[in-house]
Curated annotation (Swiss-Prot):
InterPro entries: Mur-like_cat_sf, Mur_ligase_C, Mur_ligase_C_dom_sf, Mur_ligase_cen, Mur_ligase_N, MurE/MurF_N, UDP-N-AcMur-Glu-dNH2Pim_ligase. It comes from the Bacteria. It comes from Geobacter sulfurreducens (strain ATCC 51573 / DSM 12127 / PCA). Its cofactor is Mg(2+). This is UDP-N-acetylmuramoyl-L-alanyl-D-glutamate--2,6-diaminopimelate ligase. Meso-2,6-diaminopimelate binds at R385, D409, N410, P411, R412, G476, E480.
Length: 509
């Protein structure tokens, strides 16, 4: 594709050089540039792409899109724009043939519930006979193809290229998680969504966003800008959780017809006569397409909201109630979301991705409703991330758990012991007994807490003290199979660790 064709979609401020030059690829990482490539000099939080123009040129870049004309290279084609990220989004969509124009696209955003909702929407699509590709926190997948996801929502070039590949391989729909970072950085600005779904908004990512209003503002763009009906997709919808206070605001400002969902009597999609049990969720589903009983094997009130979100998305796509019911009642299993780990001791071991205060409380509420024995919770808080949620999560765990074991969770460049010290400030004032980890090897009676820097040791301790009827919750990492210490990533999987820990404690090691 010629550079002049790409330039037409970005309204450049200034251009220099031969715009008839052929472009063979788009890149925002100078290390990945290949011959004939167009490089985007993006300004980031920790680095500035303008500093890497020379490196990109050495690797074969023939042109650059930039914001700072004073950094423009001599003897190289360049295009100056006001927003390089927006330009990259538009150019990427054009370069890869506008892959979202011809298939239904469902975008799901919110603090919690995105991943489970994508799995449920995928199941509904499958029931309708529509093979759907899914892009999210766990993986990018379609059919037998599965690629681990480096980001919830990739940069716009990778996103458009991935969707192009999946559509070419036969995907007839796309279901994707849309992160606040992606919305803030315009990664999805050139995706044409048929349905935008809002799950909820609670504290998270305040290391990146200034405050909750900024966080909400990023999420809101999907509903106030990106789902507006247009000539390509004149019928679009916004599925919004109106029980959430931020969702209630979106209901009033969305630019597409709203399908509200929740438990309130005036929600367009709602559940009535709901019963929660160890077997799942049962009740009556009320939709604009009719009313019907339903049952799902998913557990807890928070998963009821995920189910309603998926139902609202199905309504937005115009799918029948029978199809929607068939999807949500199927065997939907989400890795690292209240995922059970088998053992021979009669202990219920659950691995969950809950890494925010709200998510942890939702999971622990569900666990406490199902528990017949004690609840032992192992969790930590990530380094180089929002520090404000650390004591909040500790207080929540202390409130619901009989024993809280605070440990590490991707400490990154922070000192693990320092993170744990901050976490403990939320549980120490509760007056619970503080155990030495070594004394817990003999078991415990009083409600309390302890800490271990090693997550491996923390999981082993939980396995040692648990008895039949107890529930052990390993929270924070879920599907992740790594631990980030410093700047290095090491293999670590809570599920594997739990299996080994219970096997070891069974044998008396």
């Amino acid at each position: 594709m010629r550079l002049e064709d790409l330039a037409r979609v970005v309204d450049p401020i200034a251009v220099r050089g031969d715009l008839t030059r052929e472009i063979n690829g788009l890149y925002c990482d100078s290390r990945q540039v290949r011959s004939g490539g167009l490089f985007f000099a993006l300004k980031g939080v920790a680095s500035d792409g303008h500093d890497f123009i020379a490196s990109a040129r050495e690797r074969g870049a023939v042109a650059v899109v930039l914001e700072d004309e004073t950094r423009a290279p001599c003897g190289m084609e360049w295009i100056r724009v006001g927003d390089a990220r927006l330009a990259m989004s538009r150019m990427a969509a054009l370069f890869y043939g506008q892959p979202t124009d011809g298939v239904p696209v469902v975008g799901i955003t919110g603090t919690n519930g995105k991943t489970t909702t994508t799995y449920l929407v995928e199941a509904i699509m499958s029931r309708a006979g529509i093979p759907a590709a899914v892009l999210g926190t766990i993986s990018y997948r379609f059919g037998s193809k599965l690629v681990p996801a480096p980001h919830t929502t990739p940069e716009s070039v990778e996103l458009q290229a991935t969707i192009r590949d999946l559509v070419d391989e036969g995907a007839k729909a796309v279901v994707m998680e849309v992160s606040s970072h992606a919305l803030e950085q315009r990664r999805v600005d050139s995706c044409r969504f048929d349905v935008a779904v809002f799950t909820n908004l609670t504290r998270d990512h305040l290391d990146y966003h200034r405050d909750m209003e900024s966080y909400f503002g990023s999420k809101a763009r999907l509903f106030t800008e990106l789902v507006a009906p247009d000539g390509v997709k004149p019928r679009r919808a916004a599925a919004i959780n109106r029980d959430d206070s931020y969702g209630a605001r979106l209901v009033e400002t969305a630019v597409a017809p709203v399908i509200s969902y929740g438990l309130a009597a005036d929600a367009a999609v709602r559940a009535e006569n709901v019963v929660f049990s160890v077997d799942g969720i049962a009740g009556t589903l009320v939709t604009p397409f009719g009313t019907a009983p339903f049952h799902s094997h998913l557990l807890g009130r928070f998963n009821l909201y995920n189910i309603l979100a998926a139902v609202a998305a199905g309504v937005g796509l115009g799918l029948s109630l029978d199809v929607i019911l068939g999807g949500i009642e199927g065997d939907v299993r989400v890795p690292g979301r209240l995922e059970r780990v088998h053992n021979e001791r009669g202990v219920t071991v659950l691995v969950d991705y809950a890494h925010t205060g709200d998510a942890l409380e939702n999971v622990l509420k569900t666990v406490s409703e199902l528990a017949t024995g004690r609840i032992i919770t192992v969790f930590g808080c990530g380094g180089d991330r929002d520090r404000g949620k650390r004591p909040v999560m500790a207080e929540i765990s202390g409130r619901y758990s009989h024993l809280t074991i605070v440990t590490s969770d991707n400490p990154r460049t922070e000192e693990p012991a320092a993170i744990i010290k901050e976490v403990l400030t939320g549980i120490i004032p509760m007056g619970l007994r503080e155990y030495d980890a070594r004394e817990l090897n003999r078991g415990f009676v009083e409600k309390g807490f302890t800490s271990l820097v090693s997550r491996h040791d923390a999981i082993r301790l939980a396995a040692t003290v648990a008895v039949a009827g107890d529930i052990v919750l390993l929270a924070g990492k879920g599907h992740e199979d790594y631990q980030i210490i410093g700047t290095e990533k090491f293999h670590f999987d809570d599920r594997e660790e739990a299996i080994a820990a219970f096997r070891s404690s069974d044998s008396g090691e």
